Amino acid sequence: MSTYLIGDIHGCLDELLALLAQVNFDPQQDTLWLTGDLVARGPASLDVLRYVRSLGPAVRMVLGNHDLHLLAVYAGISRNKPKDRITPLLDAPDADELINWLRRQPVLQVDDQLKLIMAHAGITPQWDIETAKMCAREVEAVLSSDSYPLFLDAMYGDMPNNWSPELTGLARLRFSTNALTRMRFCFPNGQLDMICKDTPENAPAPLKPWFDLPRLVDPEYSIIFGHWASLEGKGVPEGIYGLDTGCCWGGDLTLLRWEDKRYFTQRAFKAEAEINNNNGFAAGEEVQH
């Protein structure tokens, strides 16, 4: 009985299955944590959703910004971009079923026994665990409700970028969504910067990665995140684990076995140059909310 944590899959089903085969994953006994962005950019978003859904309670996942963007495209709010390669999913006979399953997935996972927290982008240094749980529940409640298209239409935007308990309504939901699914850099006071997409060493002062600022989260808890492929899982403090290693860009899909902290990787089956030439986008490009 093992706990496996895997970074952003982005429609790379073959690599996911090969990686799970390396560790003899057994959905009857093991638990699979997924950092979000199951879809877009890779070749098999539809089959990834079908497979992950088929695993039932063996999976603990969170939604990423690309998953939310898919929901917005399906709702007719955002445009379907060819480079995302999600048309087969949108046209699938079980699309309604998959989309309704996806929008009921959480944006935050907390396991008090394992002392694990997982969010796609991380946890803003302005939140403690209880605030993160509260804000995540608010986003999840509206996503799973009949009014979810209203939220999806309002989630695009970078403001507000500073947490306050006084935030309300769609502004509060937008901040929470950005903090949980898009965040990379913060100002020294914890305010989000939603512009810089660079590596930490190339970021302009005074920006710092969210994980390098003093945080309110109980240090007994480890934080698992994806989203930031250019980190390649490196340069993070003890107790922080970045698992997105850019499989859809020609990099690796990375798995961390929690019990012994051992990493396993599966190289992308297509080289980065081939992927980029076929799809016409640059590594690191992301959906803008």
UniProtKB/Swiss-Prot annotation:
Signal peptide start-end: none
Keywords of the record: Hydrolase
Top enzyme class: hydrolase
Molecular function (Gene Ontology), one example: bis(5'-nucleosyl)-tetraphosphatase (symmetrical) activity
Matches recorded under InterPro entries: ApaH, Calcineurin-like_PHP_ApaH, Metallo-depent_PP-like
Gene3D superfamilies tied to this protein: 3.60.21.10
Catalytic activity, EC: 3.6.1.41
Catalysed transformations (reactions): P(1),P(4)-bis(5'-adenosyl) tetraphosphate + H2O = 2 ADP + 2 H(+)
Similarity comment text for this entry: Belongs to the Ap4A hydrolase family.
Purpose: Hydrolyzes diadenosine 5',5'''-P1,P4-tetraphosphate to yield ADP.
Protein name as it appears in the record: Bis(5'-nucleosyl)-tetraphosphatase, symmetrical
Annotated organism of origin: Yersinia pseudotuberculosis serotype IB (strain PB1/+)
Lineage, opening ranks: Bacteria, Pseudomonadati, Pseudomonadota, Gammaproteobacteria, Enterobacterales
Gene expressing this chain: apaH
